Amino acid sequence: MTNIRKTHPLLKIVSTSFVDLPTPSSLSSWWNFGSLLGVCLVVQILTGLFLAMHYTSDTATAFNSVTHICRDVNYGWILRYLHANGASMFFICLYLHVGRGLYYGSYSYLETWNIGMLLLFAIMATAFMGYVLPWGQMSFWGATVITNLLSAIPYIGTELVQWIWGGFSVDKATLTRFFAFHFLLPFIISALVMVHLLFLHETGSNNPTGIPSNPDMIPFHPYYTIKDILGFLIMLTVLSLLVLFSPDLLGDPDNYIPANPLTTPPHIKPEWYFLFAYAILRSIPNKLGGVLALVLSILILAIVPMLHTSKQRSMMFRPMSQCLFWLLVAYLLALTWIGGQPVEHPYILIGQMASVLYFLMILVLMPLTSIMENLLLKW
């Protein structure tokens, strides 16, 4: 009798994707983050769904509804903090996943990489809109400052901002539409994830060596299912520790003050996972220039495949490129730190230097180093 798993139309898709999928035998723990992102997405959708049952998207009651969830709803506090800190875990996994792709040359799979970039932008948009919903001081002023950046677009900027706001300032209309989009986008993200996996399974996974591993494949189950489950346990343990012991560690205390359009917080800043881009934005004195640098800091990932000049795919056997890669990581960490500091000396200068080095590294130094490595290896 034939196994139903291999004949049933629906089960066959699941089977070829998660059971019988031929997978390189040399995948390291850096390949765990894709499945961890899937777990994060499920956690966010489930906790978000239950939070939406009690949340009201009205400026008069939004802040109080979040307080009500934490105080009066059964296990509402754990849902709220799982959702807030789950977003942080999401971005940690996301940045590690992208970093893995850059290090091991996974961007050679252009369709998978481009869908991944769409996913990155969609997740960033979702997280930004979610941060506005509790309607605290940082929610309100963060929304005002970030949406106002669109006014830098020549000719249509001001009209565009007012169209997004639904009025002349961030108000009830803005909050309602942000809630609607924050609820909708995760389902669009889920669809994009399926397309991402579809393209990945067309080519098969990359591996740490960057060398085709067709002669040495193993089935996904049981080898990588067990490995992924270990990853889930580690991530969920870290998330649980964060939620149960220091739930406000990554948040901003100003968000416990109800939104007040009449008083500005001393230092407006986004959540920690956007600080690197915020630092790049602030390091350019011109408004339009800053907005362009902000967008390009993430959009630069789209041209990374074109800047690949090495004859090798992965950085595993390229020590000079490895040094530059870890310097790039250091610049990103420096930018994250600077984004959380006030705009004063010496932070301004450090931010400007780190911003220039970030772009210089990706656009000039890494491609040149790859060419030099080719020459050293007489390729």
Curated annotation (Swiss-Prot):
Cellular compartments annotated: Mitochondrion inner membrane
GO-annotated biological processes: mitochondrial electron transport, ubiquinol to cytochrome c
Spans through the membrane: 33-53, 77-98, 113-133, 178-198, 226-246, 288-308, 320-340, 347-367
Record's keyword annotation contains Iron: yes
Annotated residues for binding of a ubiquinone: 201
MF GO annotations: metal ion binding; ubiquinol-cytochrome-c reductase activity
Pfam families according to UniProt: Cytochrom_B_C (PF00032), Cytochrome_B (PF00033)
Keyword terms: Electron transport, Heme, Iron, Membrane, Metal-binding, Mitochondrion, Mitochondrion inner membrane, Respiratory chain, Transmembrane, Transmembrane helix, Transport, Ubiquinone
Cofactor: binding comment: Binds 2 heme b groups non-covalently.
Membrane among keywords: yes
Binding residue positions for heme b b562: 83, 182
Binding site for heme b b566: 97, 196
Principal localisation: mitochondrion
Reported cofactor(s): heme b
Topology with respect to the bilayer: Multi-pass membrane protein
Family as reported in the entry's similarity comment: Belongs to the cytochrome b family.
Function comment: Component of the ubiquinol-cytochrome c reductase complex (complex III or cytochrome b-c1 complex) that is part of the mitochondrial respiratory chain. The b-c1 complex mediates electron transfer from ubiquinol to cytochrome c. Contributes to the generation of a proton gradient across the mitochondrial membrane that is then used for ATP synthesis.
Subunit structure, interactors included: The cytochrome bc1 complex contains 11 subunits: 3 respiratory subunits (MT-CYB, CYC1 and UQCRFS1), 2 core proteins (UQCRC1 and UQCRC2) and 6 low-molecular weight proteins (UQCRH/QCR6, UQCRB/QCR7, UQCRQ/QCR8, UQCR10/QCR9, UQCR11/QCR10 and a cleavage product of UQCRFS1). This cytochrome bc1 complex then forms a dimer.
Additional observations: Heme 1 (or BL or b562) is low-potential and absorbs at about 562 nm, and heme 2 (or BH or b566) is high-potential and absorbs at about 566 nm.
Name this protein carries in UniProt: Cytochrome b
Taxonomic source organism: Macrotus californicus (Californian leaf-nosed bat)
Gene: MT-CYB
